[in-house]
């Protein structure tokens, strides 16, 4: 049963590039860029780029990203990282993924935000050309900070410039970062700007802040919600999620580590599914959380008694929630049915 449910892990819609670099890749590219690392082996390095068992909250969790980001400041490194991630996803048997990153975090040296987007797109195309994935796409993250509105607006302009509907490429924007420190309500200007330009978006909300953050994201017009766990605390928000069919990108391992939920028994996934919320299952950060999409399903099978019907619903929800055209969603379903006929 457990192995069977792990097989449902073939789509990941909430996957951060900088939180999913392999230690082996980091060692290779640290040498190429003359960056000193705190450890010389992949096993030893993992301790520095993954969350500790006693992680206190999301803010501590986010500190694990400093080292990986330091290695992603050249076009060559950024392209290679995207390609490497896609190849690892392919080895894990995935068929579709949406990889997200914040262009503004890759400008510490000489790259512009547009340079970063172009580099990631090159890596995306190279990765897809060398794998059997149905497709992969990119989501550009705006960041929660006190004084970076101009950088966020630039990210949105780039998303509009490179937005694609049918070819693999940029499909949406996101708002990521320390939700508890920088409330969602302060970013209305960014999402008004995105709406005016027809750029779809997901927003991290209801992770380190309460249901009011999810409400704000819905009011802004979010197509999806990243995490959204604390929506369960408000019947008003729950009803909107159900009525609007707004998908939630849920990431159990990460949510446990950031103390969004104290224990898996408290996880609201089953309630969401039973009430008709379009919940999906994702990894968040493969390296920081030491997980993969199959591990997320395995965890829920072993400790949450996830059923086959629930696993199947999560997979169907992921197809429906993907930033894909309706034609591509039908093609993705057909691809899964042909490649993994036992799943659907």
Swiss-Prot record:
A molecular function GO annotation = zinc ion binding
In this chain, substrate is annotated as bound at 16, 18, 177
Assigned GO CC terms: cytosol
In this protein, the active site sits at: 207 (proton donor)
What reaction does this enzyme carry out catalytically?
adenosine + H2O + H(+) = inosine + NH4(+); 2'-deoxyadenosine + H2O + H(+) = 2'-deoxyinosine + NH4(+)
Q: Identify the residue position(s) of the site Important for catalytic activity.
A: 227
Q: Which residues are Zn(2+)-binding?
A: 14, 16, 204, 284
UniProt keyword Cytoplasm present: no
Which coenzyme or cofactor does it need?
Zn(2+)
GO terms classed as biological process: adenosine catabolic process; hypoxanthine salvage; inosine biosynthetic process; nucleotide metabolic process; purine ribonucleoside monophosphate biosynthetic process
Presence of the UniProt keyword Membrane in the record:
no
Q: Which keywords does this Swiss-Prot/TrEMBL entry list?
A: Hydrolase, Metal-binding, Nucleotide metabolism, Zinc
Can you quote the record's cofactor note?
A: Binds 1 zinc ion per subunit.
Q: What class of enzyme is it?
A: hydrolase
Residue span of the signal peptide, if any?
A: none
State the superkingdom. Answer: Bacteria
Function, as annotated: Catalyzes the hydrolytic deamination of adenosine and 2-deoxyadenosine.
Similarity comment: family membership: Belongs to the metallo-dependent hydrolases superfamily. Adenosine and AMP deaminases family. Adenosine deaminase subfamily.
The name under which this protein is listed is Adenosine deaminase
This chain's source organism reads Haemophilus ducreyi (strain 35000HP / ATCC 700724)
* Gene name for this UniProt entry: add
């Amino acid at each position: 049963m457990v192995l069977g449910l792990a097989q449902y892990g073939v789509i990941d819609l909430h996957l951060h590039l900088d939180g999913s670099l392999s230690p082996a890749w980091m060692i290779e590219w640290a040498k190429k860029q003359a960056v000193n690392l705190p450890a010389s082996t992949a096993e030893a390095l993992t301790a520095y780029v993954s969350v500790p068992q006693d992680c206190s909250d999301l803010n501590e969790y986010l500190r694990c990203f400093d080292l990986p980001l330091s290695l992603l400041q050249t076009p060559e490194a950024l392209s290679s990282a995207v390609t490497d991630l896609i190849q690892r996803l392919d080895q894990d048997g995935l068929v579709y993924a949406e990889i997200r990153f914040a262009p503004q975090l890759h400008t510490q040296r000489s790259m512009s935000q547009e340079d970063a987007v172009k580099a990631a797109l090159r890596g995306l195309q190279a990765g897809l050309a060398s794998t059997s994935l149905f497709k992969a796409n990119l989501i550009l993250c705006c960041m929660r900070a006190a004084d970076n509105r101009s950088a966020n607006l630039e990210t949105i302009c780039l998303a509009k410039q490179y937005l694609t509907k049918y070819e693999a490429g940029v499909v949406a924007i996101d708002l990521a970062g320390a939700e508890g420190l920088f409330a969602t309500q302060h970013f209305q200007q960014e999402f008004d700007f995105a709406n005016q330009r027809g750029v779809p978006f997901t927003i991290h909300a209801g992770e380190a802040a309460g249901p009011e953050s999810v409400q704000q994201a819905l009011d802004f017009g979010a197509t999806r919600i990243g995490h959204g766990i604390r929506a369960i605390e408000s019947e008003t928000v729950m009803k909107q999620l159900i009525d609007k069919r707004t998908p939630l990108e849920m990431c159990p391992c990460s949510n446990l580590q950031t103390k969004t939920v104290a224990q898996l028994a408290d996880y609201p996934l089953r309630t969401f599914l039973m009430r008709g919320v379009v919940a999906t299952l994702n990894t968040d950060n493969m390296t920081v959380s030491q997980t993969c999409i199959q591990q997320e399903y395995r965890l829920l099978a072993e400790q949450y008694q996830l059923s086959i019907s629930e696993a199947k619903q999560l997979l169907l929800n992921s197809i429906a929630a993907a930033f894909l055209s309706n034609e591509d969603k039908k093609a993705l379903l057909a691809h899964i049915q042909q490649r993994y006929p036992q799943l659907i």
